[in-house]
């Protein structure tokens, strides 16, 4: 069987943890940040865990993670 290809766009967006979960960036932290509070911006700068309902799709896109 041939090797599976990794979707490079997904590989740049998601990182696997040691336990097999995937981490992602939060939305709403790219631009238009003036009216957002410091607390919100600090929260948005942290990583989030990919929801378990989406984890299977991410795993298919990054087979060797």
Curated annotation (Swiss-Prot):
GO biological process: translation
GO molecular function annotation: structural constituent of ribosome
Keywords from the named record: Ribonucleoprotein, Ribosomal protein
Matches recorded under Pfam families: Ribosomal_L35p
InterPro entries linked to this entry: Ribosomal_bL35, Ribosomal_bL35-like, Ribosomal_bL35_CS, Ribosomal_bL35_sf
Tree of life domain: Bacteria
One CC-aspect GO term: cytosolic large ribosomal subunit
Family according to the record: Belongs to the bacterial ribosomal protein bL35 family.
Name recorded for this polypeptide: Large ribosomal subunit protein bL35
The organism of origin for this protein: Prochlorococcus marinus (strain MIT 9312)
């Amino acid at each position: 069987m041939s090797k599976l290809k990794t979707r490079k766009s997904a590989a740049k967006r998601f990182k696997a943890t040691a336990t097999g979960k995937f981490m992602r960036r939060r939305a709403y932290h790219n631009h238009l940040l003036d009216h957002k509070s410091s607390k919100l911006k600090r929260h948005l700068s942290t990583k989030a865990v990919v929801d378990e309902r989406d984890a299977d799709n991410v795993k298919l896109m990054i087979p060797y993670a």
